[in-house]
Amino acid sequence: YKWLNCNQVERVWEQRNLCYEYGVRKLWIVNVGDLKPMEYPIQFFLDMAWRPEAFNPNNIFEHTITFAAQQFGEEHAKEIADIIKLYSKYARRVTPELLNANTYQFSYDEWPTVVREWNNLELRALRVYQKLDPRWYDAYEELVLFPIQAMQNIYEMYYSVAMNAKAESPTEINYWAQRVEKLYERDSLLCAHYNHEIANGKWDHMMDQVHIGYTYWQQPEKQVMPKVKKSDEAAYLCHKETDGYISIEAGNFKNNHKATVIPDLGKTECAVTTL
């Protein structure tokens, strides 16, 4: 709740409407957390505070479209509004500070599903970015693209931590451990891009908030990469068949061989010869 926006405007409407209906109409106070990441929900709150009766569950999305049009023009406003809506829906499930490898389960396909949702949303956001007028790039990164990429990355990182814990073979264990390390590094690169490159560093230090390494509600002093296990055993690629038909590429032998591999010969990966 400190690092990125995790507020759904639908929730803002529901709570403010309760206030209004129960007679709290003179003064509304909101703890914004941090102004910069919360620009859109703050805008919604202020607009609703000005005219509470103008908002209802069926026209909230229209407000998001209007906001997107004001920032990026009419052409892509509806698509951007839908991306913003889905971002806040996904982000609201759990704050990035409290996300960890045990947040979602594998038994109900939860982890792969939520990671896939974030991956698809990032692709949508990138496609729109490429269509925009360059004068809107900075604003789009601040309001739309960076939050999605940052959340997608942290979700994939903790998913990789979970896969590392679940893995049994040395190859899988080390693959997922390396994946965690790369994603942890990418988190710092994304934040550095926001701080130093977007708008020529106008918002330097805005993304310095610690968001990885929480063990309880209070924030740690510094970022700490999630723990992973590693294997020192010699690792080999294992080919598993699930359809009853067993085959491997000619060059994927493991031992007891005197063959020479010829890359790219044949229909698939390679061929072998005894010469």
Language model regions located:
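Extracytoplasmic
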Residues: 216-275
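Generic recognition of flexible, low-complexity loop/linker segments
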Residues: 14-18, 143-146, 235-237
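C-terminal non-catalytic alpha-helical accessory regions
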Residues: 60-214
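Short, flexible loop/turn elements at secondary-structure junctions
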Residues: 33-36, 71, 88, 252
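Aromatic-lined carbohydrate-binding surfaces of glycoside hydrolases
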Residues: 3, 32-48, 92-111, 258-274
